[in-house]
Amino acid sequence: MIIYRKNFYFIFLFFIASLSYGDAHGDRSIKLEGVENDQTYSSPIKLNFIVENMKVRPAGVMEENSGHHHLLINLNELPDMTKPLPMTKNIRHFGKGQESTSLELKPGKYTIQLLFADHNHTPHKIPLITKKITFFIK
């Protein structure tokens, strides 16, 4: 009986702690529309960037709970999430606050992720990033 009670308290405390963690992140989310995993498309592809419970603002505009989108294309490893994202052919910045784009891609296999970062291109403490999507261009 004592073991059962200890397990119950442990589970209860874990549950309460997980709620606190969830509140710290809130119900913020990010979504990339226009491509799905393991599908084939013709170029150009039209992508829509959706973020919930955050404000989309241009780079340089410092405002709480805001930022802008970045596309990570064909990255094997994520960049350092504690520093501003570099601007490369594989890390595309949408610093004007764009919420969609059209990508002209050559035939082949691609991976893509959407990442929401602050006014300085630095990912938020709890990064808003989509899962990696693999797709093909014919």
Regions inferred by a protein language model and the residue ranges of each:
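Sec-dependent N-terminal signal peptides
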Residues: K6-I16
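N-terminal signal peptide c-region/cleavage motif recognized by signal peptidases
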Residues: I16-G22
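Short, compositionally biased P/S/T/A/G/V-rich stretches that sit at domain boundaries
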Residues: D23-S42
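Short amphipathic, basic-aromatic surface patches that mediate peripheral association
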Residues: I50-V61
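Short coil-to-beta strand junction motifs in C2/discoidin
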Residues: V61-H69, I129
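Short acidic/polar inter-strand loop motif in beta-rich domains
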Residues: L78-D80, A117-K125
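Short, solvent-exposed, Trp/other aromatic-anchored flexible loops in extracytoplasmic proteins
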Residues: L85-H119
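Short beta-strand elements
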Residues: K125-K138
